[in-house]
A protein has these predicted regions:
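Collagenous Gly-X-Y triple-helix signature in extracellular proteins
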Residues: 1-285
């Protein structure tokens, strides 16, 4: 794999502070981030109605939630962005925040620049990599389940998340891996819902309700990134996954992001999952 690094945005990059100024692309786009259905299915905190949405999208696909930053709160825990874009704190051992990655790569940034397009409120964006994001519609859910029982074609790709619930504060990362299937030239995973609140039902972006333990077909689609020209980095427009613990509760967080469980997940799993479909030889030409 080429020289890719995933990280999270800092408190200063998001809001601005005495050490860093707010990123221009965040100032234009807004601080809030929408979450994917995969975020909800992997334990993200969901605000059920559409009162909490990004400015760009007031529909079910624009619903916001809390997402991690890489900054400490000065009291051994982590700074987060809440569903309204406010600066709040979260215990380092919680799992319900969304992961909104930023991609750093000195090589890739110049290669993908020709594919940039105009985005919301003067921003520019680009599609790069693929990831499971939103649930297929109800009709397709039934079709895919029937095809699955008959035997569907696998692509050879897979995606790894954490199987531990948010309420378990003692257990470390326990990977669960979902294989990717192909149907009519589209890719999907069949994931078991691991909702934040066991026993509740949640409406996904397809308008259907699901309960904890239900299997849901989620389409794999291109990831959209905001282009941060100031820092040669790409910032995911959405929170892509939840359920990942930031740090063991026995370890205080003092801002050393490289030593966190979150960074280990980004490096070991997420960066590979996001870009496994990328043609690296083409990008090097």
């Amino acid at each position: 794999m080429m020289d890719y690094e995933l990280t999270l945005l800092s408190e200063g990059q998001i809001w601005g502070n005495d050490k860093e100024r707010q990123l221009d692309v965040i100032r234009k786009y807004g601080i809030k981030a929408a979450i994917t259905d995969l975020c909800i299915l992997t334990g993200g905190y969901l605000y059920e109605n559409t009162n909490y949405t990004i400015d760009e999208d007031r529909s079910l696909t624009g619903r916001t939630s809390c997402f991690w930053t890489r900054s400490d709160d000065g009291d051994n825990d982590v700074r987060e962005v809440d569903a309204d874009g406010e600066r709040v704190d979260i215990y380092r051992y919680k799992r319900y925040d969304a992961v909104r990655p930023a991609l750093r790569s000195s090589v890739i940034f110049s290669q993908i620049s020709p594919n940039r397009v105009s985005g919301y409120n003067g921003t520019e964006e680009v599609e790069f990599g693929e990831y499971p994001q939103n649930a297929a519609d109800s009709r397709m859910q039934n079709i895919l389940e029937s095809e699955y029982k008959r035997g569907m074609s696998k692509t050879g790709r897979s995606y790894t998340f954490d199987s531990v619930t948010d309420y378990d504060r003692d257990t470390g990362f326990k990977p669960v891996t979902y294989e990717e299937y192909e149907y009519q030239e589209k890719a999907y995973i069949r994931i078991k819902a691991n909702f934040y609140c066991d026993g509740n039902k949640f409406m996904l972006s397809n308008g259907a309700y699901y309960r904890n333990g239900d299997y849901v077909w989620v389409e794999v689609s291109p990831v959209k990134w905001l282009i941060d020209d100031e820092n040669n980095q790409l910032i995911s427009k959405k929170g892509l996954v939840s359920g990942i613990r930031f740090l063991d509760k026995r370890t205080n967080y003092k801002g050393d992001f490289d030593r966190t469980e979150m960074k280990e997940y980004l490096d070991r799993y997420m960066v590979k999952d996001l870009f496994q479909s990328v043609d690296f030889e083409y990008l090097q030409d």
